[in-house]
């Protein structure tokens, strides 16, 4: 009987005997309830809307960040929940000048944060040392010499709107990265800013101005002569007034 059947009929007969229920068909309702994604995308999607920052403020830039807590800006809508413990945070926001004595504490806080973790350098003093980078021997010339920085936010100080823009850009970075690539890009060496290129500036006060006749120190004898001349002029003025 099989010899008289066509190949198509034989395949259909084989499917009926092997699978009597038939091939399952994916309905429209079932397709709307299935999400196809990768582990990296699912992991990044869960993290980008729940960044928990650790606020490390040492100077005036942190005052601008404190304005975000109020109802006018309301940074809670971005899922930012400030934490007081580095073990519960995944975002470190450094705002203000970092000194040599505070550098070990900052590095310790960063190392206590669990992976994956991110850093935002906020303000000119945090990024380059700011106005203290010219002649200060205690200011760190850039926090990226201590810990790896993911996003730089320049300004003195940055506006709250700029902080929001930095958070949005960081969320885009979080949503496009891979876990394995993130581990490969971790910093393995750290170089502290202990040597500064300082230059000697000579004093402009050389004392040459004292040699000028117009700026010489007045002697006591000269003061007596000036007082006598003033008295004489006063007496002459009094005599002129009496004669009038």
From Swiss-Prot:
GO terms under biological process: aerobic respiration; electron transport coupled proton transport; photosynthesis, light reaction
SUPFAM superfamilies linked: HydA/Nqo6-like (SSF56770)
UniProt cofactor(s): [4Fe-4S] cluster
GO cellular component: plasma membrane-derived thylakoid membrane; respiratory chain complex I
UniProt entry keywords in alphabetical sequence: 4Fe-4S, Iron, Iron-sulfur, Membrane, Metal-binding, NAD, NADP, Plastoquinone, Quinone, Thylakoid, Translocase, Transport
Cofactor mode of binding and number, as noted: Binds 1 [4Fe-4S] cluster.
Principal place of residence: membrane
Quaternary structure and interacting proteins, as annotated: NDH-1 can be composed of about 15 different subunits; different subcomplexes with different compositions have been identified which probably have different functions.
Role description: NDH-1 shuttles electrons from an unknown electron donor, via FMN and iron-sulfur (Fe-S) centers, to quinones in the respiratory and/or the photosynthetic chain. The immediate electron acceptor for the enzyme in this species is believed to be plastoquinone. Couples the redox reaction to proton translocation, and thus conserves the redox energy in a proton gradient. Cyanobacterial NDH-1 also plays a role in inorganic carbon-concentration.
Protein name according to UniProt: NAD(P)H-quinone oxidoreductase subunit K
Organism of origin: Prochlorococcus marinus (strain MIT 9515)
